[in-house]
Design a protein with these regions (language model features):
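Short hydrophobic segments within beta-strands
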Residues: 36-37, 178
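A general structural detector for well-ordered alpha-helical segments in enzyme core domains, enriched
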Residues: 51, 116, 155-162, 201-205, ...
Length: 260
C-alpha cells in the first residue's frame, strides 16, 4: 500500500530500520498509543505527515497525536501554553477535566485534538510516548529542584509528576520518554544566539527515567544529528525534513520494539 502526502505525492516510508514490519505489527497492531509532545512530533511540514503517523503506518498501531507546538514539559505560568504542557496534558487526561484545554483550544489551534481527547477512554491506552524538553531548553526552564522533586516548574520535576500521575491512574500503562536533540547554531532566542545545552537537560531526563525504570528513547544519539547530517535531517535547524522524520520514526520503532 502506498502512502501519500496532502499534495497527492507518494511518500517513501523507508521501511522499518532493522525491525521487520511483521514483527512490529505483531506487537503493536491495534494498540492505542498516546503521543504527548511538541512541534517535532506535531508538524506536518514539509511533507504532510508526522512522526507518529509514520509509526502508525509501519506498525498498525492506533496513534493519538496530541502533540502541540511550543509546549514544554514544565509549567511556565502562561495559561494557554500550560494547558498543553506535559503537566497540563497529563492532568486533564487522568482527571477527565478538560476545562483549561477547552478554554485555550481555539487560540492554540487544538480544537480537533481536544475533542478527540475527550472522546477517548484514556484508561484503555496501551502506551504513552512523551517527547518534550526541547522548548524547556529554548525557554530556559530550570532543570530541577533538589528541595522539591515534584516541582512542576522544572523539567525534572514535571517529568516525575507526569510519570507519577500516569502510573497512579493506570499502573499497567507502558510509558516511554524521548530525550532531546541538539539545536543547530544560528537559532536565536530573544535576539541572542541560543546555547542549546541539551546534554544537561538530557542528563536530568535520563536520571528521572533510570530512577523510575521508564524506558528512554535516545533521540540525542540515535538520530545521528551532527554538522554533516543536519541539512539532511532538519528543515529549519530544529524540525525534521521528510528524511529526518523517517529516521526518527525508525528510531522510536526499534526502541519500542526492544523495550516492550
Amino acid at each position: 500500500m502506498s502512502l501519500y502526502d496532502i499534495n497527492g505525492n507518494e511518500i517513501l516510508t523507508g521501511g522499518t530500520g532493522g525491525s521487520s514490519q511483521s514483527e512490529l505489527q505483531r506487537k503493536f497492531k491495534d494498540k492505542d498509543i498516546v503521543w504527548i509532545g511538541d512541534s517535532i512530533h506535531a508538524y506536518t511540514q514539509p511533507d504532510g505527515v508526522t512522526i507518529p503517523y509514520l509509526f502508525q503506518y509501519n506498525t498498525g498501531a492506533k496513534c493519538y497525536n496530541w502533540c502541540q507546538g511550543g509546549t514544554t514539559m514544565a509549567l511556565m505560568d502562561i495559561a494557554n501554553y500550560d494547558a498543553f504542557s506535559g503537566v497540563g496534558m497529563v492532568d486533564c487526561l487522568t482527571s477527565r477535566d478538560f476545562t483549561n484545554q477547552e478554554t485555550h483550544m481555539s487560540d492554540r489551534g487544538f480544537t480537533t485534538q481536544v475533542a478527540e481527547m475527550k472522546a477517548f477512554d484514556f484508561s484503555k491506552a496501551d502506551y504513552v510516548i512523551i517527547e518534550l524538553g526541547t522548548n524547556d531548553n529554548i525557554k530556559l526552564v530550570d532543570l530541577d529542584n533538589e528541595d522539591d522533586p515534584l516541582d512542576t516548574h522544572t523539567t525534572g520535576g514535571a517529568l516525575r509528576y507526569m510519570i507519577k500521575k500516569l502510573l497512579t491512574y493506570n499502573p499497567k500503562l507502558n510509558i516511554a520518554v524521548c530525550n532531546i536533540q541538539d539545536g543547530v547554531e544560528g537559532r536565536r532566542n530573544e535576539g541572542l544566539e541560543l546555547v542549546y545545552v541539551s546534554k544537561d537537560r538530557n542528563e536530568i531526563i535520563k536520571s528521572v527515567c533510570d530512577k523510575l525504570n521508564i524506558p528512554l528513547i535516545d533521540i540525542f544519539y540515535l538520530l545521528g544529528l551532527n554538522d554533516y547530517t543536519s541539512s539532511t535531517l532538519l528543515s529549519d535547524g530544529l524540525h525534521r525534513t521528510h528524511e529526518g522524520k523517517l529516521k526518527q520514526a525508525k528510531v522510536i520503532e526499534r526502541q519500542m520494539n526492544y523495550y516492550f
